[in-house]
């Protein structure tokens, strides 16, 4: 999957941040920036430089999700991977305690209970964190994060490369508390987000699936994001029935979660079922699925909003934005938590964004100005 940006294609601020971090490896560093400004890309280039440093540097990379861990691994060469330890935050306890420095992405989501473990790994932290994208209830407080990293050199990225102005305005029209620092620029193009009103859930899911397959290409996969694993099951079941898949699809929701720190592949059964039926669908996240598959064939990745954190895809679909759905599956979700999740989900889109619903639309849909959305019309089939 195309996501990594070559060093010569970085903007000047990104390049300076990398050089400053490499030149000051005995200090803490905090890379900041709006969603899509390239924080993960900066950290990945830092890892590349550290992996080839002489004398050798003992370095660990850590982040919250298996999906983002897998993404980082796909951006490194085999030689670089051999020289870097990579872990989720939950798996840090099994790592060594004498790193020269730890590089950590999505630090706004690190649980409070993991901070003492992180502190034992190294005296030097290089992190990326965007407080607007904090979506986990277990996440540490702002004061705890500041205490863990400061004093630190701050690197503020000001150019938003991933999303265009249309997606930026959609995301910030729903999550109006998103902080945009002065002199921030957003990519300009004519691509407009699309809205589809399904006649039923089946019509909505099948239509969005068919479009996701149509616009997918090698190295430019589509991603269908849904709020919960229960909805992933509904989506898969609907597509399986519509396409006459053989057998009953295993459940995503009931898949066994691995123990902390062990090798994870919780959706092995459902992905084997999809592969057997020659489906381009693949459940990605939690250690299951592979981004490498999209390098050689059309893929449609199926994920929860939470699992998509930190990733980006050429084509992003957000179905089931229907009146009665909560975007945060845990009970007692606040309005702010749902808005942050919508913000995170929409800002995964690198080229195309599709929103859809059936029956009555979710309140967030009604908050988006009409001029930001164009009506999606079904593609005519060629027989």
List the predicted regions and their residue ranges:
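Structural recognition of the conserved hydrophobic beta-strand(s) that form the central parallel beta-sheet
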Residues: 61, 124-130, 156, 355
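Conserved interdomain hinge at the start of the Helicase C-terminal
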Residues: 195-220
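N-terminal pre-P-loop "Q-motif" helix
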Residues: 2-27, 114
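Conserved coupling/interface region of RecA-like P-loop/ASCE motor cores
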Residues: 133-137, 144-190
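Walker A/P-loop
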Residues: 24-46
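Core RecA-like ATPase module of SF1/SF2 helicases and allied nucleic-acid translocases
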Residues: 37, 66, 85-89, 93, ...
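Inter-Walker segment of RecA-like/P-loop motor cores
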Residues: 60-100
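SF2 helicase catalytic motif II
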Residues: 98-114, 125-128, 132-136
């Amino acid at each position: 999957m195309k996501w990594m940006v070559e060093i010569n294609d970085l903007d000047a601020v990104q390049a300076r941040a990398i050089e400053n971090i490499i030149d000051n490896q005995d200090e803490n560093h905090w890379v900041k920036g709006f969603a899509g400004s390239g924080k993960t890309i900066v950290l990945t280039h830092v890892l590349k430089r550290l992996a080839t440093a002489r004398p050798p540097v003992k370095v660990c990379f850590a982040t919250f999700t298996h999906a983002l861990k897998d993404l980082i691994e796909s951006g490194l060469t085999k030689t670089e991977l051999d020289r870097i330890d990579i872990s989720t935050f939950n798996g840090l306890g099994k790592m060594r305690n004498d790193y020269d420095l730890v590089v950590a992405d999505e630090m706004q989501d690190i649980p409070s209970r993991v901070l003492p473990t992180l502190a034992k790994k190294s005296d030097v932290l290089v992190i990326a964190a965007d407080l607007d994208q904090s979506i986990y209830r277990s996440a540490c407080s702002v004061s705890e994060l500041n205490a863990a990293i400061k004093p630190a050199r701050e690197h503020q990225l000001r150019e938003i490369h991933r999303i265009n102005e249309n997606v930026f305005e959609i995301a910030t029209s729903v999550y109006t508390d998103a902080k945009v620092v002065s002199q921030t620029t957003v990519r300009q193009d004519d691509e407009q987000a699309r809205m589809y009103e399904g006649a039923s859930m089946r019509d909505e899911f099948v239509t969005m699936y068919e479009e996701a397959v149509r616009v997918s290409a090698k190295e430019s996969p589509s991603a269908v994001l849904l709020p919960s694993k229960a909805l992933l099951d509904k989506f898969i079941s609907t597509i399986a029935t519509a396409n006459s898949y053989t057998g009953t699809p295993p459940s995503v929701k009931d898949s066994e979660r691995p123990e902390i720190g062990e090798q994870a592949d919780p959706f092995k059964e459902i992905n084997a079922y999809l592969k057997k039926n020659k489906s381009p669908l693949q459940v990605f996240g939690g250690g299951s699925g592979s981004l490498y598959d999209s390098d050689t064939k059309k893929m449609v990745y199926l994920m929860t909003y939470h699992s998509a954190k930190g990733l980006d895809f050429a084509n992003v679909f957000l179905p089931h934005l229907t009146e009665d759905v909560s975007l945060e599956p845990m009970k007692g979700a606040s309005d702010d938590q749902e808005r942050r999740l919508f913000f995170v989900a929409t800002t995964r889109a690198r080229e195309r964004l599709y929103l859809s619903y059936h029956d009555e639309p979710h309140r967030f849909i009604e908050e988006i100005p009409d001029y930001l959305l164009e009506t999606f019309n079904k593609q005519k089939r060629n027989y």
